[in-house]
Structure formats: C-alpha cells, structure tokens
Amino acid sequence: GQHPSGIGAKSDHGVTGLALLAFLGAGNTHREGPYAGSVARGIATLTAAQRADGSLARNAEFFAALYCHGMATIAVAECLAMSGDKALEPALERAIRHTVAMQHPQTGGWRYAPGDRGDTSQLGWQVMALFSARNAGLRGCEPAEARAL
C-alpha cells in the first residue's frame, strides 16, 4: 500500500504506464483484446494530460516526475508499435522531445532536472523509452541513445 505520509500519491501516470505495459504484454491494445477498453482509457488518460513541455508525468512530485514520464512514454510507444495507430505519434513525439531535453548533454544520463548528472535507475527508464519509440517507428532517437550508451 501507499506510505501513510502520502509519498507516491502523485505518481498515477507512472502506475498507469506500468499497468498498461502488463495489458500490452498480454497482447491487448486499445483496439484489440479482451481488455481493449481498459487500455484505451489508460492511453487516453496519459495523452490527454500531456503537459506543454511533452512530459507525460502529469502532476508527479519532482523526484518522481521523470520516472513517471518514462513509464508512461514506454506504454504509449508500445501501444503504437503493437496497434499501428498513427494517432498516437504526436503524443509520442512530444514525449520523446521531453526525454531528450532532460538528458545531460555531455554524460548522456538523466536524473531529476535538465543538466543533472544521471543515475542508473533513470537511465534504464529513459533508454527503454527511446528504444520503444524507435521500435514504434519514431525517427531521430539514435543520437540520444548513443549519448546514453
């Protein structure tokens, strides 16, 4: 359960992303499968609340925001890759632009704010978001991937 202090209360888009990955991993998309309705609602929730800067973290706390963004971005990318629904491309493109903007320009890592030296937990989520976006057909992820690796 949630910590009594409320820690994690504003990480709903990260949790939604993770739940979507479970549905997607079982073969469901927002168009097909016994849980298509659930996937459709989850994807709509993530994309409808996308911030102007491209973040999919919605109202996540500072230290949770980039984690939530990465999880949600992976879910959108995987849904696009599985369904071929081009309507998801603009949201994914904005999300990846945010991912790249948050990357440290020299070390290639991610942390909590632009320019922060990276840590491995953030690196994993953001690199997976880049790989998933590339696998979904998004072009231009390679320079950020190369900086990270």
Residue ranges and their predicted role:
Residues 1-149:
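Preference for long, amphipathic alpha-helical scaffolds in soluble/luminal domains
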